[in-house]
Every structure is written in structure tokens, then in C-alpha cells.
């Protein structure tokens, strides 16, 4: 671990003195592929909607649902750094993310469900990204305020992990793969250890300030120490009181899960995040339900992409969260969030960008994701030509 330290006062002064330009990446010298992706995102904004999907399990059943229903798969693929440190074994997704981007040329977005120990004296005992005040089975008392106090074991832990993630992202840069990078998501909520510790709708100034310092620490180390050039930064703070300097992110994200699923435009939420993010493009960085393109365009709630969560948000499951299979042994759409007719209509809409619609996608090679390729070959045989 390097002795590099972030000078917060100097960094904030430097950032605030710089004009905000939503048209330009905050990375001063991005890789050519990163710049190309940025220009493409800008060309879509307000006119088209890029389809996305978050993944967890290695079999990636979500693809089977999309492919068998529509003959297409989403253009953006969401993966997670949650398993990078070894505290949450079995959740390492980096190899899959790298393989998918290399094979298909699809767009990657990466979040970080950051597992942290409950007991710094016995870090293997219990870890979680959920804070101790939640009702989840696994949770942590890892303290965001102590995290930002130099000399504490919590501080040393996060600096080590930040640099570990930077090394992984450098691997993507060396492979010429840009990443839509979304750390410290949903920070206004009190369910993650890095977030606001107050009750819903309120704010705890101490934890809010610590969160902002943690954001600036990640930004500073990635940008100025590790000099990563392949990132498009997505800020997902979810409230104006959590806002960080606009010169530290390129796109603003909002995560929306309604108690009753609906396909409305989410105009109120779109307007809300637009009001405090300085003209940055706005995206639906996580969702339970995909909005209707007609409604988004009618209302002017032109989310750049959408990203349904994994598992039962896409395919039907039983009471033990196992996929319910159809007569062909394949997972089927979950009608609670999107039935077969809705999925077909959305993925055939010319305003919706799927993987094959990306301008650099090679339609001759048809490089399906590996897990989907293997499952289809096993089920239908070589005669399909897949």
C-alpha cells in the first residue's frame, strides 16, 4: 500500500475552480475506445434507450430468457466487484466481465457491493455491505466515519481495497475495454455501510461528509495515482444532500424499485436527479421495471439506459428462488416485472439499442456470451449453427 494521501481541501478547491462541461469526459486523456463509447452514449441520449441487464450467477439465465423470447440480448451488461477481496467467496465476476466484453464488444457497467468486516480484529468472521441497522441476515457495523480517520484499521482496509479494484480496472484498460464505473451506489439510503446513517428522508451530517470524502478518495486515487483512463464515472448518490462535485462524474444514475412494478416513465425521479447534477446525462442505473419508450419520450424522461436487477426481476422463480422452467427446460419471463409480450415489444422497438445494434458489433461473428452459447448448444445441439 502506497503512502499516497488525498488532500481534500486542495482537491475540492481545484475541482470547484474548473468549469463544468457535461459534453466532455472528466478524464482528461481517455483511451480512444472510452472516448468512442462516450460519443456514442451522447448520440443516443434523448433519442434512443440502451438496454441493459445486471448479472450475478454464472449460468446467467437472464440471457436465456431474453434470447428465447426475443432473439436478442441487452447491449449493456452489469457486473459487480463484490467478491474481489475474498471476503465474499464465490462471487468473483471479473473474469466473466472481461470475457464478455472481449467476445462481444458489448458495454460494461460495474458496481461495487463492497463487503467490509463487522469486526476488524477478526475480518473473516462476518462481512457484508449491508449496515447493522438493516434487517438482513448478514450485516456489518463497519463505520464510515472511522473509515475516513487516518490511522484506523478501517481506513487502512478501504485504501487497500480501493487500490485492489484499481488494479483490476487497469486490467480492463490494458485490454482496451472501457467501463461505466458506478461505485458507492444508493448512498442517500441507510442500508449500505458507506451511506447516510439517518432515517429515510433525513440526513446525518457526519456520515454524509465521510461518504463524500470516500468518494473523493476513490476518485483521486483512480485518477491521479493509478491514472486510469478507461472509466466513465457514474454517480448514484440519490439525493441533493449527497451531491459531490460534478467534475468527479460523467453521468448521474438513479436506482428505482417500486413496490408495485410499473412501466411508467418515472418522470418525477428523472426531474429530481436532473435538478442537482449540472446538466449531466441521466441514467436508470438499476430498476425493477423497464419504462415504456413511448412514455419516456412523451414525458421527456429520457433515461440513457436501463438496468433491471438479476434473477426474479427477469425470470420466474419458485418460493426457494429457483428458476421456474418451461416445457423445454428453459427459464421463462416473470410476468410480475415484464411478461413475454412486453419483452418482445420492447426489444423489437427501433429506439431500443440491443447488443447487435451497437455500431461496432460484428454481426458476422455472432459472438454470443459464453454461458448462453454453451446452454443453447447443450439444449438444441450443433445443428442450430450457434
Regions found by a protein language model. Name each.
Residues 52-54, 182-184, 215-241, 279-290:
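Aromatic-lined carbohydrate-recognition surfaces of secreted/lumenal glycan-active proteins
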Residues 3-22, 45-57, 280-386:
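Substrate-binding cleft of secreted/luminal carbohydrate-active enzymes
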Residues 58-87, 92-112:
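Catalytic domains of carbohydrate-active enzymes, especially glycoside hydrolases
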Residues 2-82:
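N-terminal regions that are enriched for targeting/export leaders
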Residues 46-49, 72-75, 103-108, 174-180, ...:
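Loop/turn elements at helix/coil->beta-strand transitions in domains of secreted/extracellular proteins
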Residues 239-261, 309:
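Aromatic- and acid-rich polysaccharide-binding/catalytic face
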Amino acid at each position: 500500500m502506497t503512502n499516497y494521501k488525498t488532500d481534500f481541501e486542495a482537491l475540492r478547491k481545484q475541482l470547484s475552480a474548473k468549469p463544468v462541461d457535461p459534453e466532455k469526459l472528466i478524464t482528461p486523456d481517455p483511451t480512444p475506445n472510452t472516448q468512442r463509447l462516450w460519443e456514442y452514449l451522447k448520440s443516443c441520449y434523448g433519442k434512443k434507450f440502451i438496454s441493459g441487464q445486471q448479472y450475478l450467477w454464472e449460468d446467467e439465465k437472464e440471457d436465456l430468457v431474453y434470447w428465447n423470447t426475443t432473439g436478442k440480448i441487452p447491449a449493456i451488461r452489469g457486473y459487480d466487484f463484490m467478491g474481489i477481496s475474498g471476503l465474499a467467496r464465490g462471487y468473483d465476476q471479473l473474469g466473466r466481465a472481461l470475457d464478455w466484453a472481449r467476445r462481444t464488444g458489448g458495454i460494461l457497467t460495474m458496481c461495487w457491493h463492497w463487503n467490509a468486516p463487522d469486526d476488524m480484529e477478526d475480518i473473516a468472521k462476518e462481512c457484508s455491505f449491508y449496515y447493522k441497522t438493516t434487517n438482513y441476515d448478514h450485516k456489518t457495523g463497519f463505520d464510515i466515519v472511522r473509515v475516513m480517520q487516518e490511522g484506523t484499521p478501517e481506513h487502512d482496509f478501504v485504501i487497500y481495497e480501493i487500490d485492489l479494484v484499481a488494479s483490476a480496472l487497469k486490467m480492463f484498460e490494458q485490454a482496451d475495454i472501457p467501463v461505466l464505473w458506478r461505485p458507492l451506489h444508493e448512498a442517500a439510503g441507510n442500508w449500505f455501510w458507506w451511506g447516510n446513517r439517518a432515517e429515510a428522508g433525513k440526513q446525518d451530517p457526519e456520515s454524509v461528509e465521510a461518504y463524500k470524502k470516500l468518494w473523493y478518495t476513490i476518485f483521486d486515487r483512480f485518477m491521479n495515482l493509478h491514472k486510469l483512463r478507461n472509466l466513465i464515472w457514474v454517480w448514484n448518490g440519490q439525493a441533493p444532500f449527497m451531491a459531490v462535485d460534478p467534475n468527479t462524474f460523467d453521468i448521474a444514475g438513479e436506482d428505482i424499485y417500486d413496490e408495485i412494478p410499473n412501466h411508467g416513465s418515472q418522470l418525477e425521479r428523472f426531474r429530481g436527479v436532473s435538478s442537482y447534477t449540472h446538466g449531466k446525462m441521466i441514467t436508470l442505473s438499476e430498476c425493477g421495471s423497464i419504462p415504456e419508450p413511448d412514455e419516456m419520450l412523451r414525458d421527456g424522461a429520457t433515461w440513457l439506459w436501463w438496468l433491471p436487477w438479476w434473477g426474479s426481476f427477469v425470470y420466474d422463480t419458485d418460493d426457494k428462488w429457483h428458476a421456474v422452467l418451461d416445457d423445454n427446460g428453459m427459464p421463462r419471463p416473470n410476468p410480475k416485472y415484464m411478461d413475454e409480450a412486453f419483452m418482445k415489444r420492447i426489444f423489437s422497438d427501433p429506439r431500443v439499442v440491443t447488443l447487435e445494434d451497437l455500431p461496432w458489433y460484428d454481426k458476422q461473428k455472432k459472438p454470443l456470451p459464453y454461458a448462453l452459447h454453451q446452454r443453447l448448444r447443450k439444449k438444441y445441439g450443433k445443428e442450430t449453427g450457434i
